[in-house]
């Protein structure tokens, strides 16, 4: 009987270890991405569908490109009258607590968003957890920080930059820990959140899109295209 019990306990322990290893394997480690070429082992491009609701465009892989300047460029284009294509790049793996940094130059135009964020949700079989750095193209002298925990948001915070982010590259970051999120601009702390902190690992995402029905937030998109957001590099340091 003791031997049978030992076998059962050992089997359960090995099973749990397997589950733990599987979860760990799905969560990526520290890395630096210079965006000199496209790494399909690390990234994937959204293609052929729309998020709907306030997103007034279709994601196209062709709207994510690498330039001769050694940067990733996301494009907002119009293939036909009043139809719009946009660009989104996201990690293959999910990532958890740590420091997320990006050196980027957002697009400038009313009615659009350029972003850097982590996201996971029901399509991944998890709660909707998200941490955002967003630039509203109507005023790129400000940056918006936000986060969602199990679908609950309303944590928006605007920070004045003291410069126009669309004119030159700057470094933006957030340090995500179990009890806090801290957002930085060029190494300077701009905002700290300490309540309802998300816990589920998410994919690293960057996108450029035009909105509809959210004019109070973004302003009305005027159809100007092509428009570009530029990403020089990004880095994740696991903590």
Curated annotation (Swiss-Prot):
Keywords, comma-separated and alphabetical: Disulfide bond, Glycosidase, Hydrolase, Signal
GO biological process, one term: carbohydrate metabolic process
GO molecular function terms attached to this record: licheninase activity
Keyword Repressor among record annotations: no
Group of enzyme by EC: hydrolase
Keyword Aminoacyl-tRNA synthetase found: no
GH16 domain ranges (all copies): 26-239
InterPro entries recorded: Beta-glucanase/XTH, Beta_glucanase, ConA-like_dom_sf, GH16, GH16_AS
SUPFAM superfamilies, A to Z: Concanavalin A-like lectins/glucanases
Location of the active site: 134 (nucleophile)
Pfam families the record matches: Glyco_hydro_16 (PF00722)
Database matches in Gene3D superfamilies: 2.60.120.200
Catalysis: reaction(s): Hydrolysis of (1->4)-beta-D-glucosidic linkages in beta-D-glucans containing (1->3)- and (1->4)-bonds
Protein EC: 3.2.1.73
Additional observations: Beta-glucanases of Bacillus have a substrate range similar to lichenase of germinating barley.
Protein family membership: Belongs to the glycosyl hydrolase 16 family.
NCBIfam families, sorted: BGlucanaseBglS (NF047856)
Annotated protein name in UniProt: Beta-glucanase
Gene it is expressed from: bglA
């Amino acid at each position: 009987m003791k031997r049978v019990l030992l076998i059962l306990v050992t089997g359960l322990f090995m099973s749990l270890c397997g589950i733990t290893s599987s979860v760990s394997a799905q969560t990526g480690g520290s890395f630096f991405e210079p965006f000199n070429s496209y790494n399909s082992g690390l990234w994937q491009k959204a293609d052929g569908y729309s998020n709907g609701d306030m997103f007034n465009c279709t994601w196209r892989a062709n709207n994510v490109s690498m330039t001769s300047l050694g940067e990733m460029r996301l494009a907002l284009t119009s293939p036909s009258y009043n139809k719009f294509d946009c660009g989104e790049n996201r990690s293959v793996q999910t990532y958890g607590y740590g420091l997320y940094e990006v050196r980027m130059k957002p697009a400038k135009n009313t009615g659009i968003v350029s972003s850097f964020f982590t996201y996971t949700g029901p399509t991944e079989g998890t709660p909707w957890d998200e941490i955002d750095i967003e630039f509203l193209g109507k005023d790129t002298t400000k940056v918006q920080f936000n986060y969602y925990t199990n679908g609950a948001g309303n944590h928006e915070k605007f920070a004045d930059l003291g410069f126009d982010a669309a004119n030159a590259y700057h470094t933006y970051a957030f340090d995500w820990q179990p009890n806090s999120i801290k957002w930085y601009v060029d190494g300077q702390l701009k905002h700290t959140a300490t309540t309802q902190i998300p816990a589920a690992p998410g994919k690293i995402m960057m996108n450029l899109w035009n909105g509809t029905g959210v004019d109070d937030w973004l302003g009305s998109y005027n159809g100007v295209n092509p428009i570009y957001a530029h990403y020089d590099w990004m880095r994740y340091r696991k903590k």
